[in-house]
Regions:
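Structural and coupling elements of P-loop NTPases
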Residues: 1-677
């Protein structure tokens, strides 16, 4: 039986970063130093344990979030290694939804990069406490203090260096622990397994004293109890300092910052120490809140085995044709053979197997407890975002919101045999990744897949071939658009029809008006049940949302519209759910056609890092692509250019940028919003 003490010694963390910050290398070192793996897997050799998919090993990037468990200082640490590429941001989002803490990895050369900001804000969205690791201190151009300054400028939480580097670039030899006031160095002959504390060299003592004093001052500013001791001049113990760091980290006031070089096996063990010392256990996070799906009353679950079961399905994977569901258990317990209730679907299911995962390897267990992340076999109906609970104590947790795709591609099966396999394969891929959308076009007899970026689509097509042995012809990528309206209109529709022996009556009056960018379709009822009985309001809203799936210009979904139900009528004995749904959908569609509809295109946030000598050419090219410059930041011999550019204008940009800068510039992009074409 998992006890309360075990809960306090459990950590659920994610390792998140911008692509190429060294995130997976950090995770591989963690597995090696905790004894979980007996060989260091290297990303550049395609041997990283956590990057187990063939596509990950070939490209040297993480595509899917991988789960593992290891031990450190008598604590059990569940780790999710997440992707850094923007096309797979949703993998990070759904991982952070179920995690209690995060290790954010930064590159000492690049500092705060675009995807670093994205994952940081995603963690903030779910109130996830963080520790930061500034990696690659051995690289040319590495600057720990510049990276910390960038963190301070870009984020709400205050970065608190608890270490500073000893040396930099090729002379990076260790770190100084500002809490213990000791130098920490690693023995390269043991691959960094062996490390020691020693006295701080005299030449760096003044710098150490300065940064230690800054650390203590910041803690005193944020914690009154600590401030009293600090201002009185009392002797501050390591325990005093560490307890205050933990307290202010859990309250999201600070982010402890460390440094090292994971590839050179320096600085990783202190990350584990920080995870144990400063990041929360399941007991430290607020109770989970949900609603009772039957009564709509609020339900609360604290992290305890004695509470009724509450778990969230956050990931689906195919395992040799069998469905495997990843769950975060917030309360209660799970056992093999147990019957559970899917509150999202209103269906009962049965646990066939419980598995603890280590990347793509697994260990069968008979029981799982509150606070754990576990894989389950046997849940055929469960989808990502569903709540699993006890039928006698139902609870519905907040589901996971998924991003809308911005790019699509037409595919068609090469042979009739491939056609038979294609639909099944795409269904399974959509079940795994809800950001994949599939649509069949009758006119062209083509299947159109939509995703988050060109790499995302490339991976989907590669997986169709490798995992499902399905051969397809592929069209060129194309942009996914949206539609909206520009003016306010009032519209009225009456549906009256006899179907069989029953009359169907539905009558609604709606007001449609433009809404802020970045929103969907909002439904507001401005009448009460005396005009139209409340039992029909759900059908009216459903009819509007279904009609919004296909616009009146080119058939793209309608967004950024506020719909008010302002009137209508009711006829006793003839009113029906179907009639009100049809009337509302028809009114919405006709209203949009009269409200000056326009097309919206996806706009991307683009971040270019270029040698300063090419800055003018890069900016000129962005303007030529209808882009708007947001900021230009000089960083020594290079410049960072931030811009917003239509996605349509960015096809082939990677090749053009390389040509314009002699291959010396790099860029990244992520979705901003849909806006006027």
């Amino acid at each position: 039986m998992a006890s309360k003490s075990k809960l306090s010694r459990t950590r659920n963390i994610g390792v998140v970063a911008h692509i190429d910050a060294g995130k997976t290398t950090v995770t591989e070192r963690i597995l090696f130093y905790t004894g979980k793996s007996y060989k260091m897997g290297e990303v550049h050799d395609g041997e990283a344990v956590m990057d187990w998919m063939p596509q990950e090993q070939e490209r040297g990037i993480t595509i899917t979030s991988a789960v593992t468990t290891c031990s450190w200082q008598n604590h059990e640490i569940h780790i999710i290694d997440t992707p850094g590429h923007v096309d797979f941001t949703m993998e990070v989002e759904r991982s952070l939804r179920v995690l209690d803490g995060a290790v954010v990895v930064f590159c000492a050369v690049g500092g705060v990069e675009p995807q670093s900001e994205t994952v940081w804000h995603q963690a903030d969205k779910y109130h996830v406490p963080k520790v930061a690791f500034i990696n690659k201190m051995d690289r040319v151009g590495a600057d720990f203090f510049s990276a910390v300054r960038m963190m301070s400028e870009r984020f709400n939480s205050k970065p608190l260096p608890i270490q500073i580097p000893w040396g930099r670039e090729e002379n990076f030899n260790g770190v100084v622990d500002l809490i213990r006031q000791k130098l920490l160095t690693w023995d390269p002959s043991t691959l960094g397994l062996s490390y020691e504390f020693s006295e701080i060299p005299l030449d760096v003592k003044p710098q150490v004293e300065r940064y230690r004093e800054e650390m203590l001052e910041m803690l005193a500013e944020l914690d009154d109890t600590f401030a009293e001791k600090y201002l009185e001049g009392s002797l501050l113990s390591e325990k005093d300092i560490m307890e205050t760091i933990r307290k202010t980290t859990l309250s999201l006031k600070i982010v402890p910052v460390m440094c090292g070089s994971a590839l050179r096996n320096k600085g990783v063990q202190p990350i584990l120490d920080a995870v144990v010392s400063y990041l929360p256990s399941p007991e430290d996070v607020p109770p989970m809140k949900g609603i009772n799906p039957l009564t709509k009353a609020e339900e609360i679950r604290i992290s305890s085995n004695q509470e009724p079961l509450a778990a969230l399905a956050f990931k689906i994977m195919q395992d040799e044709g069998r469905k495997m569901t990843y769950l975060r258990i917030y309360s209660g317990q799970l056992k093999t053979g147990q019957e559970i209730y899917n509150a999202s679907k209103g269906k009962k299911e049965k646990i066939a197997r419980l598995l603890k995962m280590h990347a793509n390897k697994r260990e069968r267990v008979l029981q799982a407890f509150a606070g754990e992340i576990i894989a389950v076999m046997g849940l055929k109906e469960t989808a990502t975002g569903d709540t699993i609970c006890d039928e006698d104590h139902p609870i519905l947790l907040e589901p996971i919101e998924f991003y809308e795709p911005v790019i699509s591609q037409a595919i068609e099966a090469k042979t009739p045999a491939d056609q038979e396999k294609l639909s099944l394969a795409l269904d399974k891929l959509m079940e795994e990744d809800p950001t994949i959308k599939v649509k069949y076009e009758d006119e062209t007899a083509q299947t159109v897949i939509s995703g988050m970026g060109e790499l995302h689509l490339e991976i989907i097509i590669d997986r169709l071939l490798r995992e499902f042995n399905t051969h397809v012809n592929v069209g060129k990528p194309r942009v996914v658009y949206r539609e909206t309206i520009q003016k306010k209109v009032d519209i009225e529709r009456l549906f009256e029809k006899e179907l069989g022996e029953k009359k169907h009556f539905g009558h609604v009056r709606l007001t449609l008006e433009p809404w802020e960018r970045g929103n969907g379709v909002e439904f507001i009822r401005q009448i009460d049940g005396t005009v139209i009985p409340e039992e029909y309001f759900g059908a009216i809203e459903e009819g509007i949302h279904e009609a919004a799936l296909s616009g009146c210009l080119s058939g793209y979904p309608l967004v950024d519209i506020r719909v008010r139900l302002i009137g209508g009528s009711y006829r006793e004995g003839e009113a029906s759910v179907l009639a009100y749904k049809i009337a509302a959908g028809s009114a919405f569609k006709d209203g949009c056609a009269k409200a000056e509809p326009i097309q919206l295109e996806p706009i991307m946030d683009v971040d270019v890092i270029t040698p300063s000598e090419f800055m003018g050419d890069v900016i000129g090219d962005i303007h030529a692509r209808r882009g708007e410059i947001q900021a230009v930041t000089p960083k020594g011999s290079i410049s960072e250019i931030r811009a917003r550019v239509p996605l349509k204008a960015l096809f082939g940009y990677s090749t053009d940028l390389r040509s314009a800068t002699q291959g010396r510039a790099v860029f990244s992009m992520q979705f901003f919003r849909f806006d006027k074409t």
